[in-house]
Regions:
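N-terminal intrinsically disordered/low-complexity leader segments
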Residues: 1-7, 181-184
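Pocket-edge positions in alpha/beta enzyme catalytic cores
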Residues: 4, 75, 158-161
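Helix-turn-helix
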Residues: 11, 15, 19-53, 57
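Solvent-exposed, amphipathic alpha-helical segments
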Residues: 15-23, 69, 146-153
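Hydrophobic alpha-helical connector segments
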Residues: 57, 64-103
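Short secondary-structure transition hinges
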Residues: 85-132
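Hydrophobic/aromatic-rich alpha-helical bundle segments in the mid-to-C-terminal region
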Residues: 114-120, 124-184
Length: 184
């Protein structure tokens, strides 16, 4: 009896992201992902079950990668303001391909109520609270909101932003940060 081939979930997730990047969120289906990954529909279903399971896996992988990037920039005792500052510096990295991938994943995330609710809860926990009562906290939060807004404008193609313009925007946003919020 032959051994069943093992499907690389990460390659299937990459194929799903490519489908969304190339064709839009409405094209995301088990069939399209299977075609892009070069496997059967059953292969995709055996990895993720349903389209919702596929989307959830896309978002979870992206979140884990993003959180690892942020945590790598932080000291073990970092607080919420340092966490936001690290995210601002990650957002400032001019990487058009990464922006497109993030936009694809965000579009997938926005297609599911449960994932949108998780994002809402995450942002609320990140941006509200006692740390933002001080002037320093307010400046860090404002810089984070500006960086996130610029990132969304660029990633979703709402505004074409050249590398030089992105650098200028990032420098402007960095000036919003308090002097003690150095680049991690």
């Amino acid at each position: 009896m032959s051994k069943r081939p093992v499907i690389d979930r990460n390659l299937v997730l990459d194929a799903a992201i490519s489908v969304v990047m190339d064709q839009g969120i409405s094209a995301l289906s088990i069939g399209e992902v299977a075609k892009a990954a070069g496997i059967s529909k059953g292969g995709v279903q055996s990895c993720f079950g349903t389209k919702d399971g596929l989307v959830e896996a896309m978002v979870n992988r992206w979140k884990a990668d993003y959180e690892a990037s942020v945590m790598a920039r932080l000291a073990p005792d970092a607080g919420v303001l340092e966490l936001l500052t690290a995210q601002i510096h990650i957002i400032a990295i001019p990487d058009e391909e990464l922006s497109k991938r993030a936009a694809a994943i965000l579009m997938a995330m926005f297609s599911q109520d449960s994932l949108r609710a998780q994002a809402n809860d995450w942002y609320r926990s990140l941006l509200l609270g006692g740390a933002f009562e001080s002037e320093r906290g307010k400046r860090v939060r404002l810089a984070f909101l500006a960086a996130t807004g610029a990132f969304f404008l660029r990633s979703f193609g709402i505004m074409e932003i050249s590398e030089a313009e992105w650098k200028t925007f990032s420098e402007d946003i960095a000036r919003l940060l308090p002097a003690d919020a150095s680049a991690p």
